Amino acid sequence: MSAGKIVQVIGPVVDVEFPLNDELPDINTALNIKKDDGSVLVTEVALELGDGVMRTIAMDGTDGLRRGLEVENTGASISVPVGDDTLGRVFNVLGDPIDGGAEFGPDAERMPIHRDAPKYDELNPTTEILETGIKVIDLLEPYVRGGKIGLFGGAGVGKTVLIQELIHNIAQGHNGISVFTGVGERTREGNDMYWEMKGSGVLKQTAMVYGQMNEPPGARMRVALTGLTIAEYFRDVKGQDVLLFIDNIFRFTQAGSEVSALLGRIPSAVGYQPTLATEMGQLQERITSTKKGSITSIQAVYVPADDYTDPAPATTFAHLDATTNLERALTQQGIYPAVDPLASTSTALAPEIIGQEHYDVATEVQRVLQRYHELQDIISILGMDELSDEEQTIVQRARRIQFFLSQPFSVASQFTGMDGKYVKLEDTIRSFKGILDGKYDDLPEDAFRNCGAIEDAVEKAKQMNDAVANN
């Protein structure tokens, strides 16, 4: 292929000049730059400036580059290793192992990270529920197999812990393959997750791809595509159902904003890139169910300043089948996972998909919680005594439901000292139906905290009564 030379370096942006009589590289083509120390830097063509000069974005640090260095046009986009050999391994955006394990040789199967979304006639039109073992999710915002789910929340409300628990439950409960993509998050968290997953035994069913906070914006913008490409191989070639975790999709948008500014584009609303909707669509449209297999994507979405009207989370909303909203007020009450049962939604919450009994229990739980929410102002001003008997009953049951929506997580057991609970969907429906019917009105409220099925609450109430009797 043709060779060029560096004419300008501005941070992570490298301008490369090619001879005008040679064929210029296409947009998204990978270029290799051999530094003086022998290492190779990969950049990706982003813009044509004219007169044979291409503006490229570096996938690693640009230290050691100088004007005049030769640049090789690879003639293809970045490609990454795929297949069973990726399971249990950790990669960077280029598909290079970063876990100290064996390198992938030239014969390893690879796929380009830039690919078209599946065609309409390849899509699977059926809707199937994915059981997660987490009560609040399975009951009130059921996840669709092959769907896209957003975990919304500000800093420190538990998005990453919830993702870890979902990986744990899907690997243990469904023996499913997962691809975890760390986009622009803390390196410490990525390291902790690697060792936790290795210790719990789920790593052997998971491929991990990291482009963390310390990486250049080009790597953070493309690492989501690297993880998606690995997942697409298992779906399209192996015919498997795959879970794709992206933590954090906001950082994908943020990196795109940085790259857009470096390329000299005029910013759009709130300083975001004008191509925000296009970039998000190109990623999200590849995440879907086909007739061969499915990719179910669970994406943590950081909400800047807890503002859901910010263009980044608002653009993500349009692509989602279900949303799990994490609420800081619930963490202050000690309710984990801090999922807001009224703000979280799912397109699958319909009787023709989940069944009439599940639908009736879920909507009644929401009605009771909504009524409790409406009565809270009266309670705070006038007290419980001013409520009617019926309203007092609703409040008491709503508080039990609110506490019962909490659940101990396996991945958080070292912090909480409690063993994690996986609750089957039928047990979840049965338990909440019993609370709504008033079967457990005599149990103390605190017995419902951090339980699995309702039998745990009954046992906890018995222990509390025994402790009081012994005192």
Curated annotation (Swiss-Prot):
MF GO annotations: ATP binding; ATP hydrolysis activity; proton-transporting ATP synthase activity, rotational mechanism
Catalytic activities: ATP + H2O + 4 H(+)(in) = ADP + phosphate + 5 H(+)(out)
PANTHER family assigned to the protein according to its UniProt record, in alphabetical order: ATP SYNTHASE, ATP SYNTHASE SUBUNIT BETA, MITOCHONDRIAL
Function noted in UniProt: Produces ATP from ADP in the presence of a proton gradient across the membrane. The catalytic sites are hosted primarily by the beta subunits.
Gene3D superfamilies: 2.40.10.170, Bovine Mitochondrial F1-atpase, Atp Synthase Beta Chain, Chain D, domain 3, P-loop containing nucleotide triphosphate hydrolases
Topology relative to the membrane: Peripheral membrane protein
Class in the EC hierarchy, top level: translocase
Binding-site positions, ATP: G153, G154, A155, G156, V157, G158, K159, T160
GO terms for cellular component: plasma membrane; proton-transporting ATP synthase complex
Pfam families, A to Z: ATP-synt_ab, ATP-synt_ab_N, ATP-synt_VA_C
EC number(s) stated in the UniProt entry for this protein: 7.1.2.2
Highest taxon of source: Bacteria
Provenance organism: Levilactobacillus brevis (strain ATCC 367 / BCRC 12310 / CIP 105137 / JCM 1170 / LMG 11437 / NCIMB 947 / NCTC 947) (Lactobacillus brevis)
Record-given protein name: ATP synthase subunit beta
